[in-house]
Protein backbone atom coordinates (compact mmCIF):
# COMPACT_ATOMS: atom_id res chain seq x y z
CA UNK A 1 0.00 0.00 0.00
CA UNK A 2 2.88 2.41 0.76
CA UNK A 3 4.22 1.92 -2.75
CA UNK A 4 0.91 2.94 -4.31
CA UNK A 5 0.68 5.99 -2.06
CA UNK A 6 4.12 7.10 -3.18
CA UNK A 7 3.16 6.81 -6.84
CA UNK A 8 -0.07 8.70 -6.32
CA UNK A 9 1.66 11.81 -4.97
CA UNK A 10 2.79 12.84 -8.47
CA UNK A 11 0.37 15.55 -9.73
CA UNK A 12 0.94 14.40 -13.32
CA UNK A 13 -0.47 11.07 -12.33
CA UNK A 14 -3.36 12.70 -10.49
CA UNK A 15 -5.99 10.26 -11.63
CA UNK A 16 -4.62 7.83 -9.09
CA UNK A 17 -5.05 10.30 -6.23
CA UNK A 18 -8.36 9.09 -4.74
CA UNK A 19 -6.56 6.37 -2.81
CA UNK A 20 -4.43 8.80 -0.87
CA UNK A 21 -7.41 11.00 -0.12
CA UNK A 22 -9.50 8.09 0.97
CA UNK A 23 -6.85 6.61 3.23
CA UNK A 24 -6.26 9.88 5.03
CA UNK A 25 -9.51 11.74 4.88
CA UNK A 26 -9.42 14.71 7.22
CA UNK A 27 -11.99 14.75 9.92
CA UNK A 28 -12.57 11.03 9.95
CA UNK A 29 -12.70 9.85 13.52
CA UNK A 30 -11.45 6.31 13.88
CA UNK A 31 -12.84 4.00 16.48
CA UNK A 32 -15.20 6.48 18.14
CA UNK A 33 -17.77 4.42 20.04
CA UNK A 34 -21.34 5.24 19.01
CA UNK A 35 -22.28 5.48 22.67
CA UNK A 36 -20.28 8.70 22.86
CA UNK A 37 -22.85 10.49 20.70
CA UNK A 38 -25.86 8.28 20.38
CA UNK A 39 -26.74 7.27 23.96
CA UNK A 40 -30.00 8.78 25.17
CA UNK A 41 -29.76 11.16 28.13
CA UNK A 42 -30.77 9.63 31.45
CA UNK A 43 -33.06 11.30 33.98
CA UNK A 44 -31.49 11.96 37.39
CA UNK A 45 -32.51 9.37 40.01
CA UNK A 46 -35.11 10.35 42.55
CA UNK A 47 -33.91 10.72 46.14
CA UNK A 48 -35.41 8.58 48.87
CA UNK A 49 -37.65 11.43 50.07
CA UNK A 50 -38.36 13.06 46.74
CA UNK A 51 -41.97 13.32 45.71
CA UNK A 52 -42.94 11.13 42.77
CA UNK A 53 -42.93 13.00 39.50
CA UNK A 54 -44.55 12.14 36.23
CA UNK A 55 -42.07 11.30 33.53
CA UNK A 56 -42.13 13.84 30.71
CA UNK A 57 -43.71 12.52 27.52
CA UNK A 58 -41.19 11.45 24.88
CA UNK A 59 -40.65 14.06 22.23
CA UNK A 60 -40.43 12.99 18.63
CA UNK A 61 -37.38 14.39 16.88
CA UNK A 62 -38.20 17.17 14.51
CA UNK A 63 -35.76 15.96 11.86
CA UNK A 64 -38.16 16.27 8.94
CA UNK A 65 -38.11 20.06 9.23
CA UNK A 66 -34.42 20.48 10.01
CA UNK A 67 -32.23 20.02 6.90
CA UNK A 68 -29.10 20.55 8.97
CA UNK A 69 -30.00 17.60 11.17
CA UNK A 70 -30.58 15.41 8.10
CA UNK A 71 -27.30 16.44 6.54
CA UNK A 72 -25.41 15.91 9.79
CA UNK A 73 -26.93 12.46 10.15
CA UNK A 74 -25.91 11.56 6.61
CA UNK A 75 -22.35 12.67 7.18
CA UNK A 76 -22.02 11.12 10.59
CA UNK A 77 -23.67 7.79 9.63
CA UNK A 78 -25.83 7.89 12.75
CA UNK A 79 -26.62 4.38 14.05
CA UNK A 80 -30.19 3.10 13.85
CA UNK A 81 -30.44 2.21 17.53
CA UNK A 82 -28.66 3.26 20.68
CA UNK A 83 -26.25 0.58 21.94
CA UNK A 84 -27.32 -1.66 24.75
CA UNK A 85 -25.36 -2.21 27.95
CA UNK A 86 -21.73 -1.22 27.61
CA UNK A 87 -19.43 -4.14 26.92
CA UNK A 88 -15.72 -4.30 26.19
CA UNK A 89 -15.45 -3.65 22.46
CA UNK A 90 -13.06 -5.25 19.97
CA UNK A 91 -9.73 -3.69 19.17
CA UNK A 92 -9.93 -0.87 16.60
CA UNK A 93 -9.43 -2.18 13.06
CA UNK A 94 -6.50 -1.10 10.96
CA UNK A 95 -7.14 1.75 8.49
CA UNK A 96 -6.72 -0.70 5.60
CA UNK A 97 -9.60 -2.78 6.96
CA UNK A 98 -11.87 0.27 7.09
CA UNK A 99 -10.89 1.17 3.53
CA UNK A 100 -11.72 -2.36 2.39
CA UNK A 101 -15.13 -2.13 4.07
CA UNK A 102 -15.70 1.25 2.43
CA UNK A 103 -15.03 -0.26 -1.00
CA UNK A 104 -17.36 -3.17 -0.27
CA UNK A 105 -20.09 -0.77 0.84
CA UNK A 106 -19.54 1.40 -2.24
CA UNK A 107 -20.21 -1.49 -4.61
CA UNK A 108 -23.11 -2.64 -2.45
CA UNK A 109 -24.95 0.69 -2.75
CA UNK A 110 -24.12 0.94 -6.47
CA UNK A 111 -25.71 -2.45 -7.09
CA UNK A 112 -28.75 -1.52 -4.99
CA UNK A 113 -29.17 1.71 -6.93
CA UNK A 114 -28.71 -0.04 -10.28
CA UNK A 115 -31.48 -2.49 -9.38
CA UNK A 116 -33.76 0.35 -8.18
CA UNK A 117 -33.76 -1.09 -4.66
CA UNK A 118 -34.09 0.95 -1.49
CA UNK A 119 -30.82 1.45 0.38
CA UNK A 120 -31.56 0.89 4.08
CA UNK A 121 -28.95 1.51 6.74
CA UNK A 122 -29.90 -1.67 8.70
CA UNK A 123 -29.32 -3.67 5.50
CA UNK A 124 -25.91 -2.05 5.03
CA UNK A 125 -24.99 -3.08 8.57
CA UNK A 126 -26.31 -6.62 8.15
CA UNK A 127 -24.93 -7.31 4.66
CA UNK A 128 -21.63 -5.39 4.63
CA UNK A 129 -20.56 -3.56 7.79
CA UNK A 130 -21.26 -6.45 10.16
CA UNK A 131 -18.97 -6.53 13.17
CA UNK A 132 -17.55 -3.14 12.14
CA UNK A 133 -20.77 -1.36 13.18
CA UNK A 134 -18.89 0.51 15.89
CA UNK A 135 -16.95 2.27 13.12
CA UNK A 136 -19.89 2.74 10.74
CA UNK A 137 -19.48 6.52 10.67
CA UNK A 138 -15.90 6.25 9.44
CA UNK A 139 -16.87 3.64 6.85
CA UNK A 140 -19.79 5.74 5.58
CA UNK A 141 -17.61 8.83 5.28
CA UNK A 142 -14.99 6.96 3.30
CA UNK A 143 -17.66 5.42 1.08
CA UNK A 144 -19.25 8.82 0.43
CA UNK A 145 -15.85 10.29 -0.46
CA UNK A 146 -15.08 7.55 -3.00
CA UNK A 147 -18.53 7.79 -4.59
CA UNK A 148 -18.28 11.57 -4.93
CA UNK A 149 -14.76 11.68 -6.29
CA UNK A 150 -14.88 8.67 -8.61
CA UNK A 151 -18.47 8.34 -9.79
CA UNK A 152 -19.76 11.87 -9.22
CA UNK A 153 -22.40 10.64 -6.77
CA UNK A 154 -23.46 11.65 -3.28
CA UNK A 155 -24.66 9.10 -0.73
CA UNK A 156 -27.41 11.09 0.96
CA UNK A 157 -29.66 10.29 3.90
CA UNK A 158 -33.21 10.90 2.63
CA UNK A 159 -35.20 9.78 5.67
CA UNK A 160 -33.93 9.91 9.22
CA UNK A 161 -37.01 8.07 10.48
CA UNK A 162 -36.49 4.99 8.27
CA UNK A 163 -32.70 5.43 7.83
CA UNK A 164 -33.07 5.32 4.05
CA UNK A 165 -30.20 6.48 1.82
CA UNK A 166 -30.12 7.36 -1.87
CA UNK A 167 -27.48 8.07 -4.51
CA UNK A 168 -27.73 11.56 -5.99
CA UNK A 169 -25.83 12.86 -9.02
CA UNK A 170 -23.11 15.32 -8.11
CA UNK A 171 -21.86 16.24 -11.58
CA UNK A 172 -23.51 18.79 -13.82
CA UNK A 173 -26.36 17.21 -15.85
CA UNK A 174 -25.04 18.54 -19.16
CA UNK A 175 -21.71 16.81 -18.54
CA UNK A 176 -23.33 13.45 -17.87
CA UNK A 177 -25.86 13.73 -20.68
CA UNK A 178 -23.10 14.01 -23.26
CA UNK A 179 -21.83 10.55 -22.35
CA UNK A 180 -24.58 8.32 -23.74
CA UNK A 181 -24.35 5.16 -21.65
CA UNK A 182 -28.11 4.65 -21.20
CA UNK A 183 -28.02 6.41 -17.79
CA UNK A 184 -25.71 3.74 -16.37
CA UNK A 185 -24.07 6.03 -13.85
CA UNK A 186 -21.40 3.66 -12.48
CA UNK A 187 -20.14 2.92 -16.00
CA UNK A 188 -20.18 6.62 -16.85
CA UNK A 189 -17.99 7.35 -13.84
CA UNK A 190 -15.62 4.52 -14.74
CA UNK A 191 -15.29 5.79 -18.32
CA UNK A 192 -14.68 9.38 -17.21
CA UNK A 193 -11.93 8.21 -14.87
CA UNK A 194 -10.17 6.34 -17.70
CA UNK A 195 -10.55 9.26 -20.12
CA UNK A 196 -9.20 11.64 -17.47
CA UNK A 197 -6.17 9.43 -16.87
CA UNK A 198 -5.46 9.33 -20.61
CA UNK A 199 -5.77 13.11 -20.85
CA UNK A 200 -3.47 13.76 -17.87
CA UNK A 201 -0.88 11.38 -19.30
CA UNK A 202 -0.81 13.49 -22.46
CA UNK A 203 -1.03 11.00 -25.29
CA UNK A 204 -2.18 7.62 -24.09
CA UNK A 205 -2.28 5.52 -20.93
CA UNK A 206 -0.63 2.14 -20.65
CA UNK A 207 -2.99 -0.64 -19.66
CA UNK A 208 -0.90 -1.28 -16.55
CA UNK A 209 -1.44 2.34 -15.41
CA UNK A 210 -5.19 2.02 -15.96
CA UNK A 211 -5.34 -1.15 -13.87
CA UNK A 212 -3.33 0.54 -11.12
CA UNK A 213 -6.18 3.06 -10.85
CA UNK A 214 -8.91 0.43 -11.09
CA UNK A 215 -7.28 -1.69 -8.38
CA UNK A 216 -7.63 1.27 -6.03
CA UNK A 217 -11.37 1.02 -6.69
CA UNK A 218 -11.35 -2.70 -5.94
CA UNK A 219 -11.56 -3.80 -9.60
CA UNK A 220 -9.46 -6.68 -10.94
CA UNK A 221 -8.98 -7.75 -14.57
CA UNK A 222 -9.50 -11.44 -13.79
CA UNK A 223 -12.42 -11.08 -11.38
CA UNK A 224 -16.06 -10.50 -12.32
CA UNK A 225 -17.74 -7.63 -10.57
CA UNK A 226 -21.33 -7.38 -9.32
CA UNK A 227 -21.85 -4.00 -11.04
CA UNK A 228 -19.58 -4.11 -14.10
CA UNK A 229 -19.39 -7.85 -14.74
CA UNK A 230 -16.23 -8.67 -16.70
CA UNK A 231 -14.33 -5.41 -16.19
CA UNK A 232 -11.55 -6.23 -18.63
CA UNK A 233 -14.06 -7.02 -21.37
CA UNK A 234 -15.96 -3.83 -20.57
CA UNK A 235 -13.00 -1.50 -21.04
CA UNK A 236 -11.09 -3.37 -23.78
CA UNK A 237 -14.10 -4.42 -25.88
CA UNK A 238 -17.38 -2.68 -25.03
CA UNK A 239 -16.00 0.84 -24.57
CA UNK A 240 -13.86 0.25 -27.67
CA UNK A 241 -16.85 -0.92 -29.75
CA UNK A 242 -18.76 2.19 -28.65
CA UNK A 243 -15.77 4.24 -29.89
CA UNK A 244 -15.14 5.84 -26.51
CA UNK A 245 -11.71 4.21 -26.25
CA UNK A 246 -8.99 2.93 -28.54
CA UNK A 247 -7.03 -0.09 -27.39
CA UNK A 248 -3.76 -0.66 -29.26
CA UNK A 249 -0.59 -2.65 -28.85
CA UNK A 250 2.56 -0.70 -28.05
CA UNK A 251 4.95 -1.22 -30.98
CA UNK A 252 8.37 -2.80 -30.55
CA UNK A 253 7.72 -3.88 -26.96
CA UNK A 254 8.16 -7.45 -25.73
CA UNK A 255 6.37 -8.99 -23.96
CA UNK A 256 3.36 -7.34 -25.60
CA UNK A 257 1.89 -4.29 -23.87
CA UNK A 258 -1.22 -2.29 -24.70
CA UNK A 259 -2.34 1.27 -24.17
CA UNK A 260 -5.59 3.23 -24.26
CA UNK A 261 -6.41 6.37 -26.23
CA UNK A 262 -9.48 8.54 -26.57
CA UNK A 263 -11.90 7.17 -29.14
CA UNK A 264 -13.61 9.25 -31.82
CA UNK A 265 -16.92 9.31 -29.95
CA UNK A 266 -15.28 10.59 -26.77
CA UNK A 267 -13.62 13.37 -28.78
CA UNK A 268 -17.00 14.37 -30.24
CA UNK A 269 -19.07 14.20 -27.05
CA UNK A 270 -16.64 15.32 -24.33
CA UNK A 271 -14.54 18.47 -24.37
CA UNK A 272 -11.17 18.76 -22.74
CA UNK A 273 -12.48 21.57 -20.56
CA UNK A 274 -15.16 19.23 -19.23
CA UNK A 275 -12.45 16.75 -18.31
CA UNK A 276 -10.53 19.52 -16.54
CA UNK A 277 -13.64 20.46 -14.56
CA UNK A 278 -14.24 16.80 -13.75
CA UNK A 279 -10.68 16.46 -12.45
CA UNK A 280 -10.97 19.69 -10.45
CA UNK A 281 -14.21 18.51 -8.87
CA UNK A 282 -12.99 14.98 -8.17
CA UNK A 283 -9.62 15.92 -6.68
CA UNK A 284 -10.60 19.29 -5.16
CA UNK A 285 -7.81 21.06 -7.05
CA UNK A 286 -7.53 24.09 -9.26
CA UNK A 287 -7.36 23.07 -12.95
CA UNK A 288 -4.03 24.87 -13.20
CA UNK A 289 -2.55 22.04 -11.13
CA UNK A 290 -2.22 20.43 -14.59
CA UNK A 291 -0.80 23.48 -16.44
CA UNK A 292 -0.11 21.98 -19.86
CA UNK A 293 -3.45 20.15 -19.97
CA UNK A 294 -5.24 23.28 -18.77
CA UNK A 295 -3.72 25.41 -21.55
CA UNK A 296 -4.65 22.76 -24.09
CA UNK A 297 -8.25 22.75 -22.84
CA UNK A 298 -8.43 26.56 -23.08
CA UNK A 299 -7.10 26.50 -26.64
CA UNK A 300 -9.67 23.88 -27.65
CA UNK A 301 -12.49 25.87 -26.04
CA UNK A 302 -11.49 29.05 -27.92
CA UNK A 303 -11.18 27.15 -31.21
CA UNK A 304 -14.63 25.63 -30.79
CA UNK A 305 -16.22 29.03 -30.15
CA UNK A 306 -14.44 30.64 -33.10
CA UNK A 307 -15.39 27.81 -35.44
CA UNK A 308 -19.07 27.94 -34.49
CA UNK A 309 -19.96 31.04 -32.44
CA UNK A 310 -23.69 30.24 -32.42
CA UNK A 311 -23.28 26.69 -31.12
CA UNK A 312 -24.27 25.96 -27.54
CA UNK A 313 -21.54 24.60 -25.31
CA UNK A 314 -21.91 23.61 -21.68
CA UNK A 315 -21.09 26.59 -19.51
CA UNK A 316 -17.61 26.39 -18.07
CA UNK A 317 -16.92 27.22 -14.46
CA UNK A 318 -13.19 27.50 -15.17
CA UNK A 319 -11.84 30.96 -15.79
CA UNK A 320 -9.81 31.58 -18.94
CA UNK A 321 -7.94 34.55 -17.44
Swiss-Prot record:
Annotated Low complexity bias? 20-35
Kindly give any further remark recorded in the entry: Located in the Prader-Willi syndrome (PWS) chromosome region. Prader-Willi syndrome is a contiguous gene syndrome resulting from deletion of the paternal copies of the imprinted SNRPN gene, the necdin gene, and possibly other genes within the chromosome region 15q11-q13.
User: What keywords is this UniProt entry annotated with?
Assistant: DNA-binding, Growth regulation, Nucleus, Transcription, Transcription regulation
**CC terms in the record's Gene Ontology section:** cell projection; centrosome; cytosol; nucleoplasm; nucleus; perikaryon; protein-containing complex
Subcellular localization, as worded in the UniProt entry? Perikaryon; Nucleus
Is Transcription found in the keyword set? yes
Please, one GO biological process term? glial cell migration
Q: In which tissues is it expressed?
A: Almost ubiquitous. Detected in fetal brain, lung, liver and kidney; in adult heart, brain, placenta, lung, liver, skeletal muscle, kidney, pancreas, spleen, thymus, prostate, testis, ovary, small intestine and colon. Not detected in peripheral blood leukocytes. In brain, restricted to post-mitotic neurons.
According to the UniProt entry, the coiled-coil residues are none
As for what it does, the entry says: Growth suppressor that facilitates the entry of the cell into cell cycle arrest. Functionally similar to the retinoblastoma protein it binds to and represses the activity of cell-cycle-promoting proteins such as SV40 large T antigen, adenovirus E1A, and the transcription factor E2F. Necdin also interacts with p53 and works in an additive manner to inhibit cell growth. Also functions as a transcription factor and directly binds to specific guanosine-rich DNA sequences.
**Quaternary arrangement and interactors, per the entry?**
Binds to the transactivation domains of E2F1 and p53. Binds also SV40 large T antigen and adenovirus E1A. Interacts with nucleobindin 1 and 2.
Any matching Pfam family: MAGE
- Residue stretches making up the MAGE domain: 98-297
Q: Which organism does this sequence originate in? A: Homo sapiens (Human)
**Principal localisation:** other
Q: Name one GO molecular function term.
A: DNA binding
Which InterPro entries does UniProt cross-reference here?
MAGE (IPR037445), MAGE_WH1 (IPR041898), MAGE_WH2 (IPR041899), MHD_dom (IPR002190)
What name does the UniProt record give this protein? Necdin
